[in-house]
């Protein structure tokens, strides 16, 4: 009866994924012997920052992990399985190693920011594993969501794909704060993270054109209280706007 002869194998997966490896007779070379009905048991040497790996003493039809392997770091981790193949006739082959590389998957929580109209916001998430996992070279794609805010008076925003950071210059031409919500998907290589939200509150900036008053008499007072939209739509006076001034003498 033939005895299984299987050589070292490897597989790469993303964090939180499972794997299923089935050795094939004659693959990758004719030296690989996998009799029909071969089963497998294994012991595992887990990576320091990987959970979900375990030994298997009950013979299995393939080398598979039905529990997610989780990489809690922001770099690749390896798990090494020492596998014992046994033919259906009870012939035990030499052990072989199966190395599983677990690539990190980005995990980023929701964020907020606040800027003034005309300013640029920039978000570059930083790694704080295992709470927030940001592998090197993570890219970001996003769309705009505005479920509770009218964005008519907000400009400068757009959906983007595969950006190294999240950054846009936003202009608010209304007289009230506008909040825009970005739905962002982080991606590292082949490993895509769950979407997270970024809320950016954009405060309006006052804009008042030069004002010329009618003449007044000596010892009279004058009051100027600019109003949004008067005398034209260029005038923006957010609630709570205050003023300072200097005087130019007209000699």
Give, region by region, the residue ranges found by the protein language model.
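Extracellular low-complexity Ser/Thr/Asn/Gly-rich intrinsically disordered segments
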Residues: 1-251
